[in-house]
Every structure is written in structure tokens, then in C-alpha cells.
């Protein structure tokens, strides 16, 4: 059974610390998809549940790590109060993600975004639907309830075009 675990940023970092995984010790059999916000959101959006200074990628990009920066919105682009723009996953990012997932479909996946509820869950939903013949062990503490529909649709569209 392969792991398909989705985390909040905080829980992801805790799990990586427990496993003692960093850039030097991350096993090749583990695949990480790290989703952070774009620079305009990191700099300009702050709330009780989001502080941009903590929204960073833990691992350097490498063969088994995909770092993506896009925002948790339900449309392609949103002009935000405060004069900045939030941007969802782009076609290029979705194509890259689909190819990356296809190349690593036989490994364990550890996926995170800030809350672990929307963007990362869209990836979990996509992977489970794209590879239904694989028996996935998902994170029981974080069920896939509210995946970002825009992200999910972009991944599915890319898969139809490139796989």
C-alpha cells in the first residue's frame, strides 16, 4: 500500500522532523509536493490563520520534490483589496505537476499546502482518481473534504492533454 498523505504546512514540517528528513536525508522512494502561496500574497495577505513569513518550501527542488507557488482561490486570477493579485495554478504548473506525478506514481506521496484542506487535497483527489488501481493509504487525520475544484480541474485537463 502506497502512502498518499496530505498535510497542513505545520503538520508537514512536524512529520518531516519526526522522520528526520531534510535535503540530505529525504529518501528517493518518497515524493514531496510542496505548495506555497505566490509572492504577492505572502507579502500582502495576513490573517489569524496565515502568516506569509512561514509559507516557505522545506526542500530544494530535486528529482523527487516539486515546489509550486500558487494561491488558494477558485478562479484563475483575483484582484485583492490592498492592490495585489492572487494567482491560481497555471496551465504550465498543472502540466508539470501531472508529468511529475506520472513519473513518481509508484512512490509514497507527501503533499502539503498552508492549511492542507484545499490545494493539496485537489492533488490527493486527482491522484486517487488518476490511479484507482493503486491501493492508497491516506492520512486519516485529514480526509479529502474540500479540494480546490479549480486546481482539480486543471490537473485533470492537463492529464487528458499530456498523458
Predicted feature locations:
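Catalytic cysteine-centered active loop of the rhodanese-like fold, especially the PTP/DSP P-loop
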Residues: 102-134
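Short catalytic/ligand-binding loop motif for oxyanion handling, primarily in non-cytosolic enzymes
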Residues: 41-43, 75-76, 117-122
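Cysteine-dependent PTP/DSP-like catalytic domain, specifically the C-terminal lobe
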Residues: 125, 129-163
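Short beta-alpha junction loops
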Residues: 38, 72, 114-117, 142-145
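Helix-loop module immediately N-terminal to the HCX5R catalytic loop
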Residues: 62-110
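Hydrophobic, Leu/Ile/Phe/Ala-enriched alpha-helical segments that form helix-helix packing faces
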Residues: 16-22, 97-104, 127, 131, ...
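Structural alpha-beta junctions
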Residues: 2, 60-63, 103, 129-137
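Glycine-rich, flexible N-terminal cofactor/catalytic loop recognition
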Residues: 1-68
